[in-house]
Amino acid sequence: MEQAPNMAEPRGPVDHGVQIRFITEPVSGAEMGTLRRGGRRPAKDARASTYGVAVRVQGIAGQPFVVLNSGEKGGDSFGVQIKGASDQGASGALSSDSELPENPYSQVQGFPAPSQSSTSDEDPGAQWNGKLLRSQSQASLAGPGPVDPSNRSTSMLDLAPKVASPGSTIDTAPLSSVDSLINKFDGQLGGQARGRTGRRTRMLPPEQRKRSKSLDSRLPRDTLEERERQSTNHWNPSTKYNNHVGSLKQPAQSPSPSPLSGFSRARQTQDWVLQSFEEPRGRAQDPTMLQFKSTPDLLRDQQEAAPPGSVDHMKATIYGILREGSSESEASVRRKVSLVLEKMQPLGVISSGSSKAMAGQGELARKVEELQRKLDDEVKKRQKLEPSRAGLERQLEEKTEECSQLQELLERREGEAQQSSKELQNMKRLLDQGESLQHGLETQVMELQSKLKQVQGPEPAKELLLKDLLETRELLEEVLEGKQRVEEQLRLRERELTALKGALKEEVASRDQEVEHVRQQCQRDTEQLRKSMQDASQDHAVLEAERQKMSALVRGLQRELEETSEETGHWQSMFQKNKEELRATKQELLQLRMEKEEMEEELGEKIEALQRELEQARASAGDARQVEVLKKELRRAQEELEELQAERQSQEVAGRHRDRELEKQLAGLRVEADRGRELEEQNFQLQKTLQQLRHDCEEASKARGMAAEAEATVLGQRRGAVEAALRETQGDNDELRRRVLGLEQQLRETRGLVDGGEAAEARLRDKLQRLEADKQRLEEALNASQEEEGSLAAAKRALEARLEEAQRGLARLGQEQQTLTRALEEEGKQREALRRSKAELEEQKRLLDRTVDRLNEELEQIGEASKQALQQLQAQLEEYKEKARREVADAQRQAKDWASEAEKSSGGLNRLQDEIQRLRQALQACQAERDTAQLDKELLAQRLQGLEQEAENKKRSQDDRARQLKGLEEKVSRLEAELDEEKNTVELLTDRVNRGRDQVDQLRTELMQERSARQDLECDKISLERQNKDLKTRLASSEGFQKPSASLSQLESQNQLLQERLQAEEREKTVLQSTNRKLERKVKELSIQIEDERQHVNDQKDQLSLRVKAFFRQVDEAEEEIERLDSLRRKAQRELEEQHEVNGQLQARVKSLEKDSWRKASRSAAESALKHEGLSSDEEFDSVYDPSSIASLLTESNLQTSSC
């Protein structure tokens, strides 16, 4: 133990640490007190021998770590060695018994266990003072047999959790440092390879891989707990702990005490080792899947080898492979071995529980993915269904409203059915009462027959009766007076009864009429309902088609609205641009007007100048024709101006008239829209009136039931009164029994009455059967009507929705009409502005044409004047030539005459020659100027031709504009004609609507008549019922009357009357049915007309949309025309500028001509003066025809040609 630090010096610096080494023992075995040190054993020898594990806990720079080794490198030494920084032993490192791990090699008696030899890295001199005791084998450790505590050895895994005292604190910082070191080694291994890579990568077979499970820090907690349970089955942990303490106390007493630093370091390393053993307990796995063998303790005489697949075997093989041929230290090799094992353990320690957990995690991940997908799908569906949710909610609300309405209708129908059932029950009661009355009458007849038989009995009974009759005669005389009184009372009662009979007859007749009328109404209602069902089915199909059409129309209208919105935006921008352009044109027109005024002023000045020149020309030439021509042109110009003003006024009046007509048409369209709305309101009112009529019918049926009940009560009261009267009459009959003969006659009469009553009862039964059949039919009709009413309600809703859509469409049309009217007004205003601008431009053009004509005339006049001037100049030149010739001839003569004076005149001759040359040059220059004047004249002619062509082009453009204006006027006329047609159609629609109103009024009057007829029939029915009651009462009281024949005749006559009334009522019913059918046909025709009108309105909408498009196109054309007019205006401005330039040139020319005329006048005056004076001397000739004057004349001619 003392040489351990010296041995550790060549392996690097060691701060402190604990080394625990368990080494093998041969199979042959030696004595317990001796331990042999052998060399490195191969894997095969290790199988048959014991093995051990070396655990080194060292600190490198204060960071501890763990290295596990099989212990094959060193000798077969056993023991626990605690190393410190000093050279002292480890005895002082153990301060208490509970803080150190148990020494498995300590003896039981308490003597120290010596170590005969140590590993290569331990102190060879350290020895154990005791011997190892042999205990059970590895297989016996797991057995249930008891073991003596003195002969056993525990594993490190069993000791680790028991050594740590509750007072000691476990520091977790070394674990993080171990992980960091492992990561460092991983990085180093990834970058550099230490040792021999070939041997390091070599893998041994699983048979040779051994490991010590006593030091496996990666084992799960459950296996440890199982082993502890097995260990607790064998012995008590208190004895084990005591044995462990005793074994540790004995070797701790032999060496000398160490300082406190060594003790603290040893304690830290010991705590760290215990913590490393306790850490794997947190990583528990399934105990069933991880069944490892218990770690064998190094007991005495242990000869079994570790299994080939164990961790110790693997560690030993890896350590041997890494140790062979490597010069590294043992600590580094052990580090590498521990790292390799740590990396290999996850591969070998995967259990089925972890595989199940992984499979469960995979399934959970799949489920999570599926749920996430479902959630995404649901979110997408919700996002898709959110826009349709609002529509569905609206539909649900509509359906709920419809259901509520249907429930209300069902409740109403149920109430009506209950009322009809009550009426049927009342009728049944009345029938039962009639049958009971019939039975009573039959019993009365039977009693009367029995009495008659008794009266027709034997003769003694007759004699007794005769005696009784004689006795009664006396009594009768007394009773006659009372009888007369009674008869008077009876007469009064008969009168009352006749009145009641009449009332009953009327009631019965009215009741029968009501019943028949109700039956007919039911039949009509059923027929109407059938027809309405058929019509509803047809209407449903038509409505579906119309819905599709309306949807298509709505889509088209939406598209058109979008297009129109875009077009309106475009047009608004265009209108704004046009407004700006119009403003610019207005400004330009104002400028043009100013320029025009300036031009007019200039032209006035020019005209005044021309007039002055004309006056001068008149004074000079006296050309009166030109003045007249100018006057005529002025008159024509004034007339044209007046005509243009009149045309402009007429156009303005026509435009105002058209605007008024357009406003009227728009007002008519608005009136038509209002009429359409009124028609829709009237249709709605008609539907309301139909519903009211149905409601009135229902109330009438209820009133009938109530009236029947009231009549039944009244009849019961009357019957009670009649029964009381009958009782009184029976008392009278009892008193008048003696009148047998009258009774027989009365019996016969009563038999006849009974027969008639039976026939009446049979008739009543037939009527009741008919009524029941009618009732069944009515119930069926009611059911059908309910169904039809449901369908009609749906159709009505559809129609209402359709009407709302139509109203919306009409509102949209109204808005479109308003926009169109505004656009038309704006177009009218623009047209007026265009017309005004056009008129102004035309006026300007005419003025320009006139000015151009005037200028052309002036140019022609100037050309003629220039021609005349040229002719005059030519004549003057010829005269000059002739004069020169004459002068030359005179000079020659004078030369001949004055030869003597030749020398004197030589200088003059030279001068004359020079002058002749000059004159020749001047003549050449005049010819050149003449040529230039001709060229200028040709250029002027070309310019005039160009101006004429431009004037022709302007005329053509004006013609094109006139054509375009005519086309626009034709379009406007067409539009006016179309508006007239629309007015006519609107008038026709209004006529149709008025007719429909008249028909509706007629239908209302007819319905009122039918109601009155129904009331009459009800009254007749009531009277007939009263008559029937009277007849029944008469039948009941017929026993007490003496004259039944008259009553029978009256009854027969009444029956005949009733039959006639019934026939008349049937005829009236047929007539009413025919009228109802006619009314139904009329209603159908009206509905067809309304549908036609709707279609016509839709067609009108389409036509209006087309017209709107045409209007937009016309606006486009108008804009193009405006652009054209702008271009023409610009061209006119350019032409005006050119004409200004031409006018300036003409003014310069006129000025030059004025100067020339002035010079000509001065020359003519000079020539005349010369002729009068008759120049004779050469000096005067020289003075007159000096070169300066000739040059001035030539320069003036040049100026004239240049000005041209």
From Swiss-Prot:
Modified residues (N6-acetyllysine): 579
Family note: Belongs to the cingulin family.
Keywords: Acetylation, Cell junction, Coiled coil, Phosphoprotein, Tight junction
Keyword Coiled coil: yes
Start and end residues of each stretch annotated as Tail: 1162-1204
Subunit structure: Homodimer. Interacts with TJP1/ZO1 and SPEF1.
Biased composition (Basic and acidic residues): 207-231
One GO BP: microtubule cytoskeleton organization
Short motif ZIM, span: 48-62
Stretches with biased composition (Polar residues): 93-119, 232-245
Protein name: Cingulin
An example molecular function term from Gene Ontology annotations: microtubule binding
Database matches in PANTHER family: CINGULIN (PTHR46349:SF4), CINGULIN-LIKE PROTEIN 1-RELATED (PTHR46349)
Biased composition range(s): Low complexity: 247-261
Coiled-coil features, chain-numbered ranges: 358-1161
Organism lineage string: Eukaryota, Metazoa, Chordata, Craniata, Vertebrata
GO (cellular component) term, any one: bicellular tight junction
Location of the protein in the cell: Cell junction, Tight junction
Positions of region (Interaction with TJP1/ZO1): 54-67
Function: Probably plays a role in the formation and regulation of the tight junction (TJ) paracellular permeability barrier.
Domain notes: Deletion of the TJP1/ZO1 interaction motif (ZIM) decreases but does not abolish colocalization with TJP1/ZO1.
Superkingdom: Eukaryota
Phosphoserine: modified positions: 95-96, 98, 135, 137, 140, 155, 165, 214, 217, 258, 276, 338, 351, 1176-1177, 1183
Region (Head): 7-357
Gene designation: CGN
Residue ranges, annotated region (Disordered): 25-48, 68-174, 186-266, 379-398, 1161-1182
